[in-house]
Swiss-Prot record:
Mainly expressed in roots at low levels, specifically, in the root tip. InterPro entries: CAT-like_dom_sf, Plant_acyltransferase. Belongs to the plant acyltransferase family. Optimum pH is 9 using spermidine and coumaroyl-CoA as substrates. This is Spermidine coumaroyl-CoA acyltransferase. Spermidine coumaroyl-CoA acyltransferase that mediates the conversion of spermidine into dicoumaroyl-spermidine.
Amino acid sequence: MANQRKPILPLLLEKKPVELVKPSKHTHCETLSLSTLDNDPFNEVMYATIYVFKANGKNLDDPVSLLRKALSELLVHYYPLSGKLMRSESNGKLQLVYLGEGVPFEVATSTLDLSSLNYIENLDDQVALRLVPEIEIDYESNVCYHPLALQVTKFACGGFTIGTALTHAVCDGYGVAQIIHALTELAAGKTEPSVKSVWQRERLVGKIDNKPGKVPGSHIDGFLATSAYLPTTDVVTETINIRAGDIKRLKDSMMKECEYLKESFTTYEVLSSYIWKLRSRALKLNPDGITVLGVAVGIRHVLDPPLPKGYYGNAYIDVYVELTVRELEESSISNIANRVKKAKKTAYEKGYIEEELKNTERLMRDDSMFEGVSDGLFFLTDWRNIGWFGSMDFGWNEPVNLRPLTQRESTVHVGMILKPSKSDPSMEGGVKVIMKLPRDAMVEFKREMATMKKLYFGDTN
């Protein structure tokens, strides 16, 4: 059920010099402001994502040439991405300065076949990052940096990967998917993207007032659960494959536990509750401490009027579920899932989004953030829908795999739910969950996973 990431073979690449790809048509220079959510300090981090394409013997086109040309055309519609990010001298906020510099584009080759790497499914993160372009960022200075870079890596089998580095400050996961979908549409021969890009960052700017900011988690600082395994730099990554049948059986058993419930549970509500509980056990969090599940809730359709379809900036709000470790342990999965469902609904309450935007502005003004022990904090993000915006077939069929990575130090506080690799037909309709934990805690996590699987699914295979 779980596969530990490891470099199956040495990944040696021959790289060509980086080039800057500019818009294919002239676009005017300007400086663009970002939204309150874009400016959240936690969003100034690079997304690294790898899209894996199998060889297509019938296609004699060069994917590098197609993607280079498509990128140049894309930047006419998404011209801010060919600018640079910097902080305003007047208020210290991020802004995109567009002078037409272009986007870093890198080409690499490998003598390996993608199949020998299991289509990068089990590669160690640090090895897989070689398939993604490097963007050097000094977050403490005001040095400009590119918000986007691409790397195309060709393999001996004829397959290739597209590696993207894209700053979270400019777009969220939905926005990343929208941009890459537009890129592959243009590479397939379309004259323009099917979805028109929209900036409109002013729609999500909070009003500034004189109230003090409320630091998330400050009300439980000193009460948060701790783990003997943390802190540590010895962190490992696991891919947990959960089949469609197992998810259905888990949902069915939970619905039997609470027949009074009028709404069914979503896959996210079920899996987040299940994994949160197992993670708490694996880390051996102290029973009286508080553990927190963070949930990102999309708000594109919540605003009045809703954000346009082509909006690619950050558009989500975090909500939280808080329990003591003992409460989490003693609660049924259905009870926890019901709490997750209720927490998600708070993001839709009138005034909640406006207040969250105001509070984010206050925290940035005061330069305040949570600095307490965060062993018991866990975010589980859902990439199943935002990772695939639409068809990406531009001559090599759909990607056989998608792999998000982190370019900062490995964090044990974030997990991801994704669609499974298409290289394994038995996983159709299922999910894969990526988890990072201290090495010893991961052993416990796998043991707990096997026990829970036997309880809910009736087997340990």
